[in-house]
Structure formats: C-alpha cells, structure tokens
Amino acid sequence: MKKTILQEASIKYREEALANLKKFVAINTVMDLKSASESSPFGTGVRQGLDFVADLGRKLGFNVDYCSHYVTELSLGTGPVIDVYCHADVVPVSKNWKTDPFKVTIDSNNKMYGRGVSDDKGPGMASLYGIKMLSDLGYINGYKVRMIFGGNEENGSAGLEAYFHKLKKGYPSYGISPDGDYPLIYAEKGIFTYKASYDLFIPGLTNFHFGQATNIVLDEVKLKLNGVTDLEAKVAKFDMENADIRVFLAEGEIVFKGKAAHGSIPWEGVNAGLYALKFMSEVLNIPVLENIFNDYNDGRGTAFDGNYPSKYFDGASYNIGKISYEDGKLTLVCNMRLPENVGPEEACTNIANKTKAKIELIGGSPALINDPKSAFIQELLKAYVEQTGDTESKPLAIGGGTYARDSKNSVAFGCTFPGRDPKMHQDDEVFSLEDFYASIYIVAAAVDKLGKLAIRESK
C-alpha cells in the first residue's frame, strides 16, 4: 500500500510525540480524593496531568481552557465542532508489574509498557499530534476541533459531566473517543454500579477491605484469620484444589493471587476477593459465602439468570471490584454492564430476588447505540480503511465504556488494533510504537473527514 499524505507527514511528529508521552506517563494520575480540593477536584496527581496537557497544548499553538480543572480543553479553528475525547487519569497499579508503571519502558520488540500507554495517555498524545499535524497542513479550515482531556473517566466521567452541564459547553457536531478499538465501536453496554449487602457473622474477623476500583478484577487480596486450627494445611489444600488461584501464607496473612482484567470482561481474570470468600466458606462453614462465589465467579450472572443477550450484545457482565466486611455486614460493590434490552432497576430487582442480598443501585449510564449505516459511521470507516488498507475488520459492540456515551453523535475510534491485547487495567499495560505512530495519522484522517462532513451538513 502506497503511503498516504498523512502517513508521510506524520513521520516528523513521532519523536516529539513519544518524548511527551514519556513525560505524561511519568505523572501518577490515579484519582486521589484525599488530596482533592476546589482547584484539584480529582486530586493533585490528576491536576498535574491536566496542567501538563494544557502547557503542551499551548506550546503547540492550541487555545487552552482549564475548565475549572475538571478537564483540559485544547481547541483550533472555527465552525462546526468536532470533539476528540481522551482522559488523563489512569487506574491504580499493583505491585506485580515487571517494569516501573510510571515510566515508559520500550522492549526489543518496540512495545511500550507503562500505566496509561494504551488507556488513555498514548492514544491521547497520538491524537494531539495528529490534530497538530492537520493544523500545520492547513486542513482545519471551516471547522473547529476541541480536544478534551478528562480527569475522571476511570471513576465515573464526572469531568465530562461538568464540562457539558456545569460549564455549559455545547455538544459537538460529531465526536470520537480514541479510548477503544479500531475500526470503531458503534455500541457500548450500559454501565452501572450497585452494592450488595449481607448481614452475617464471620468468626475470627473484625473487618477487611478489598479493592480500589470497581472496573478492575481484584487480582490480589490479603486476609488475616484468627482462631483457625491447622490453617497452614487448610491453605495448602485450598491452593491445590483451586488451580486458577495461588493461595499461600506470608507474614501471618493468607495471600490470594488471581489475575487482573478489565471490569467489562471479568471472565478473563481471576477474582482473588471471591476466592477469599470461598476459602472462608469452607474453613468457617459459612454457606452464604460459597453462594456469593457461585453467583459472581463466572462474571456473566448465569447463576441468577442475569445475562440478557440482545441484538447487539452477547449478554451482561458483573465484576465485583470491592469487598468489605465491617460490623457484621459484608458488602460487595459490583460494576454491572447491561445490554440495551434491560434496565438497571429490573436487573437489580432480579439480583435481589435470586441472591437474597440487599441491593442498592448507586448510578450509571445507559447503553449507547449508533446506526452503523449512518454517514457519521461510514466516514470514520473510510478514514480507517484509507489509512490502513484493512477492509476486513468490522465495527464493534462492546462491554467497555468510553466518553462517547457522555456526549452526542460520538463513538469510540481506536486506538487498539484488531488482534492486539493492550492489557488495559492490568499489570504491564502495553502499546506498540508502531500502533502509537499509526494512530497519529489515523485519528487525524478521522477528524478531518468528520470536519468536512459537518461543513457539508451545515450548508
């Protein structure tokens, strides 16, 4: 395939884009409400990340709006608006990384490792330089591009909600979020959070708290149980009988080591917290804990008839991201992803009836469905095909959620190529240099096609 104009033009931006990605990843932008304030609503780390983007955007010639530090807006041009939604925040890291998660490490295969390289600092940086390239080439003519780096995508999209509703920013003609897969994602499941509570007594325990985020499979938990006879033998037996999980004693605590995965696909991980409940059910003879394990371990809601396959999706998902026990109450916090054919209230009523837990729906957002035959989607597909030559890959419907659901006329577009595993929300998150560089010109092509479409439609 002969190189396109944008492919050729993008080469000179590669070195600078990579250098600034390294600086961006070096900032720990995990949300920290302990350090939050009016000027840093998501904590000082996220604020530093948003300020870094603002300073870089200004140097590159963008107009900058700090947006009360909920998001950073970088804009160029005038006319119908095309939005590009990225996020500066990242999910927490474990101690099991093979490299420093806050340093970009590039291996011999030109793969980059670091928290945020694929979700979403790498795609964000590629998009930023793609838009800069469009400006330098004179392509941004008759339309406006707003690049929006959010500060709270991983914990509920409060940043973008403030952008549109508190700050009263207008919706775009079209928008893309490079926080998913190529060629594009036209449908996303509804994403909701609920608490499931159980009144029960666990002997030998006063309290415990597992997990930091609901959209990550719990990959490691530690538990201190008092008064259990032959504990070492019981731990060894449980470890031998449960091949998916590693269980051992260390410094007086029982360690459960599972496997992290994105909360939208919990079946690809191993939930250490659920296995801790199963262990307690066996050694302490508490059947309800075994029931909880069976209810949630497959991640699909099969045990309580909660799968709901639909026209667009293969079914629901349920990820238990937090588990706590205090004052005789066990509480699970579940990240629930639902197809368009069922509402959260109906799903929660079903769970309450089938599991006998007290269910409290906390909130969320409904499914997003775009018409794959619309001019909007077709223009994006043209951009992808023209820049990659890939005519085989089809638009996707997924369980993951992006900023696209918080806007209008928006979809996730890139930057994970078909067949790649970016290990989002897992240890050793990865993004290849080749894909990073390619996304500079692919996102640029998409933005320009949408800009021209918006101009045509405005006349």
Q: What does each of the following model-derived ranges do?
A:
Residues 65, 264-327, 333, 337-346, ...:
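An extended, acidic, His-containing surface patch that forms the Zn2+-binding/catalytic region
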Residues 2-115, 136-141:
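Acidic/His- and Gly-rich active-site-bordering loop/insert found
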Residues 94-107, 191-192, 196-200, 246-258, ...:
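Acidic-glycine-rich active-site phosphate/pyrophosphate-binding loop
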